[in-house]
Regions:
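C-terminal ends of transmembrane helices
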Residues: 20-28, 81-88, 163-164
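First transmembrane helix
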Residues: 1-28, 147-160
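Alpha-helical transmembrane segments of multi-pass integral membrane proteins
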Residues: 27-49, 101-103, 131-195, 203-210
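Conserved small/polar residues in nucleotide/adenosyl-binding loops
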Residues: 219-221
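Individual alpha-helical transmembrane segments in multi-pass integral membrane proteins
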Residues: 2-16, 32-46, 50-92, 97-114
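Juxtamembrane "helix-exit" motif on the non-cytosolic side of transmembrane helices
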Residues: 50-60, 114-127, 163, 187-198
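Membrane-anchoring/interfacial helices and their immediately flanking loops
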Residues: 93-147
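Non-cytosolic membrane-interface motifs at loop->transmembrane helix junctions
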Residues: 59-71, 127-134, 198-209
């Protein structure tokens, strides 16, 4: 199982790397959406490579319900909504608006750092289910909140789409994109809830598959 896990992580890194390079090479003039998606996928490449190196060195992977990994997951999901926003409303994204989209994530990071300074100890749990019995403590409900917030970006996409800010809308594509992202998030939630090796391997395949579907599903963007 360990070798299969290693091979899966390596394959994920390779596929995402090739996809990121292809997106950047095929970028269109005056079109930022492909560049944005290429940058987002490159973050996945970095995550896969660092995990692969750690596993090869015999390091124990950090628990999926650690506050740091949950913050990282929220960062990645927020990154993936930048692409459809740019497609829906070309040119709407600016540095200030990206900061606004990431505002609740930045607030969560600040709360996490302050909690560490105040001496809060984050008990290692293997899964969300294992934490529920201790939900009365701050370090547990904070991580539960981070788990719920993973689904928030999908609502942001629909909010942007329903405003009059967009000029290049495709209702069917937006629904497919949000559905694909939701499948990815649900697969990740299974890992958070049960934390079995089989679910981790399944999640990597689902994640890479969803990324490829996103990249080829809107080839004209």
């Amino acid at each position: 199982m360990q070798y299969l896990y290693l091979a899966t992580v390596f394959a994920g890194a390779l596929v995402c790397l090739l996809a990121s390079i292809l997106l950047f090479v095929r970028r269109k003039e005056a079109k930022r959406s492909r560049v944005i998606l290429a940058v987002i996928v490159s973050f996945s490449v970095f995550n896969y490579i660092t995990r692969f190196i750690a596993l090869c060195n015999g390091e124990t992977p950090e628990l999926v319900v650690s506050a740091k990994l949950l913050l990282q997951a929220n960062f990645m999901v927020l990154g993936y909504i930048l692409y459809p926003i740019e497609v829906i409303a070309p040119g709407w994204l600016s540095f200030q608006r990206i900061l606004k989209l990431y505002s609740y994530w930045l607030l969560a990071v600040v709360v996490y750092l302050i909690s560490l300074q105040l001496g809060v100890e984050y008990t290692p749990y293997g899964s969300l289910l294992g934490m529920l019995a201790h939900s009365g403590s701050f370090e547990v409900w904070f991580r539960l909140l981070l788990s719920v917030l993973i689904f928030a970006p999908a609502l942001i996409v629909f909010f942007i789409h329903q405003t009059r800010l967009y000029r290049n809308s495709d209702h069917i594509w937006v629904r497919k994109y949000v559905l694909t992202l939701s499948v990815n998030m649900l697969a990740y939630m299974l890992v958070l809830m049960f934390n079995h090796p089989e679910f981790k391997i399944l999640y990597y395949y689902v994640s890479v598959g969803c990324s490829l579907y996103i990249e080829i599903g809107r080839a004209h963007v």
